[in-house]
Amino acid sequence: MLRIGPSAGTGTPTGDYGIGATDLCEFMEFPSRVLQVCGDSFAGQAVGFGGWYSPIALHVESDSIDDPAGIRYNGVSGVDKPLLADPTPPGSSQLPAGVVSINRENYMMVTVTKDLTPQTSRLVKADAAKSSWPTVPGSVREASYLGGNQSQVSGYYDPIPTPDSPRGWVYIVANNFDRSGPVFLYRVPPQDFTDRAAWQGWSSVSGRWGDPATALWPDRVGGDGIRLIDGKAVLSYFNATTGNMEMRVADDPTQLGTAPVTTVVYASDWPDPAETLPPPEVNRLAQPYGGYISPASTLDEVRVFISQWNTRPRGGTPYRVIQYAVNPLKPWE
């Protein structure tokens, strides 16, 4: 593991675009550009300071995605005009809760929260060229849908045909936005993805698709990001049971529950001053979460973006995203 460095939020150049503090930063790849979608964002260097926007999308300089010095940005959407077509309910936030890309068409789950407690979730269709991303008709669900375990998602499209889906499958991991439960696995043909009722659960008990989904493993999980890298399923996530950032690699997504676990970052106490970071090779960080995988990743160098938020009294800063590079454990090694 090696820390590349802070990329967005407190103390980074995103302040040049009016984003002094932000988190999450999940990738969306379009034919025309690459975006990173972030959550509650502020013009100042701390939570609650300056203008507030949520969500926003940072414009990534495409030649910086695999830059050893770190990622760079050249703009932002969602500041002058809201990124989402649907207005934010009073007293609530609309937060990005996962991206699924199908042939470079990008869908995002948006979860409406009140004091970070999920209220509803829905899918929106992203557009690289403009804001006001529309809600997918029929995709809105109450937070209690499926026991509350589908208010945060991440997914990828594997186009390899199978006898029961000639166009392959979209694989989706899902969990509760409030970190109160484990992670579940679903699949759906790509043409049916926007119909959430069509998502087929994976049961690790029966070993079958289409049964009620069961937890891949028992730990509580927060933010998660899954990608298909060189034909393997790679899952990065916040382990809410341990407080650490972890990663799993499997030959097939149904095997993630038994895959070896790499601890990318161990949770630690806050240093003084709070924005201080240890040497780049020391994988300890106070209050980590998120964990979104870069499209520049390989199986031997997964680049992952981990958030950090100082929620202590008189805190609020740093509130930022930090890029790491990790060579995760593989089941075949």
From Swiss-Prot:
State the name under which the record lists this protein: Uncharacterized 35.9 kDa protein in asd 3'region
State the InterPro entries in the record: DUF4185
Q: Pfam families annotated for this entry?
A: DUF4185
* Domain of life assignment: Bacteria
Lineage of the source organism? Bacteria, Bacillati, Actinomycetota, Actinomycetes, Mycobacteriales
Name the source organism. Answer: Mycolicibacterium smegmatis (Mycobacterium smegmatis)
